[in-house]
Amino acid sequence: MEQRNENKTELKMIKMSDVQSQTVDWLWYPFIPYGKLTIIQGDPGDGKTTLILNIAARLSKGEGLDNDMKVTEPVNIIYQTAEDGLADTVKPRLELAEAVCERIMVIDETEKSLSMIDERLETAIKRTGARVLILDPIQAYLGGTMDMNRANEARDMTKRLSLLEEKYKCAILLIGHMNKAGGNKAAYRGMGSIDFLR
């Protein structure tokens, strides 16, 4: 008697003729799109956090990030950092950049650390209407059991984030550290699986 595989997934096919073409909506063309993941990575001390805080400050004021960027309106931003103190580092840097700090928010991790698959991310985006979510650095938000060197686990993490950004049309920026494998191309020096760089 043939046994049925209860876990078998039904095959579904999509014809490209049924797919409706869309244009990419850009936060900052051609660098940061809405509805997509963006990774900013570099060696320690390269100024990644300084760059991202200046981007956040300008967006909070509704300012363009370069001369060609259209200025529309100020946006709300969620900025999560695991490396810098909010009171002695992040806030002073934002004030120096003349940010509208009312528009830049942080999920409180006092009672429980945050991860990329934490349901609080979606709740925070819905509650604040944030158009930008920043996780600085990637490595701190993987969760205790995730191995970032395993391709399948990296894909699962980024897929969950992708669903969020597609659903809420926000931009998600991941800040990544480079490893010390000298001589390799930058894409392969990002710490963890190359699958973070989809």
How should each PLM-predicted stretch be described?
Residues 5-8, 14-16, 22-23, 27-29, ...:
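Conserved inter-motif catalytic segment of the P-loop NTP-binding fold
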Residues 39-40, 45, 49-50, 69, ...:
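Phosphate-binding/switch region of NTP-binding enzymes
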Residues 60:
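Gly/Ala-rich phosphate-binding loop of Rossmann-like dinucleotide-binding domains
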Residues 1-3:
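Interdomain "pre-motor" coupling segment immediately N-terminal to P-loop NTPase/helicase cores
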